[in-house]
Amino acid sequence: MARKYSHIIVIGVDGAGSWFKDADTPCFDEIFKDGAVTYKALSSKPTISAECWGSMLIGVGPEIHKLTNKRVSVLPYSVWSKNPTVFRRIRKAYPEAELGSYCDWNPINKGIVERNASVNKQTARDKELTPLICDYIKDKKPDFLFVHFDSTDGAGHSNGYGTPEHIKAINEVDKLIGDIYSSIESAGILEETLFTVIADHGGTNNENGKGSHGGWTDEEKYVTFAAEGKDIVSGEIKEMNIRDLAAIVLYGMGIDAPAFNEKGWTAQIPKGLFSDYDGEYLDISHLTGAAPRISNEHHKSELI
């Protein structure tokens, strides 16, 4: 399979749910005005960060990868796992590829991205992280870059999801997304880049105005995904699960994905996303996910 893009950049926005549609996001709106967008991509069960980011980067459900926030905070992801991340798959296919993972929440770098994939890893708070990302893009022109922003989830936990404070945090992240997109233009690689934004989960609020997540309400399970690049079909994506990100990345890199298997790889290419792809899209709504639980925790950003 031929490689479609020289560069793929994924911006992950923790806890943003589907609220991009309610926020003031001029950068997001301009970037994806001719792209593919959905505010109803389905999260993973339970709707908690490690379970969700793990599913997106590995292409399997939480019941398969078994990652939790506690686990990724203390244990590195096995370099021998039969379910490798997209980083390891790309490294195998392209030994000289430049790979980056710039995350506010360091457990992604510590407990999901493999140690043997030769990934440039950085950790800082969102606003401090963004200039590092922009410099990295201009200097290294990465083949694949994953970015994780976390201020949105912190605002949701502290002030409630969908509240003015939470929406304001999304507004602020929109500016950072705009800065990153501008750096791609400055690097002269925009025409060969697949640029995506994705959230992992939303959240619900208690009587004290605090937010949590982990359940399967509409507010928790529906999230934003957007993609822009050549061969992306403009319009609404009708059906998608967040784990499909792994399949999208591999397809864009020209790497054959594993065969669909309900006990393993369940990432798929959403119908109508790419103009040159017309494969079937299988229903996985009956898959149970991992054991349910609720998260009230605020992530901490620790330097590597």
What residue spans do the PLM features occupy?
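Feature captures the catalytic ectodomains and active-site-proximal regions of enzymes
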Residues: 1-304
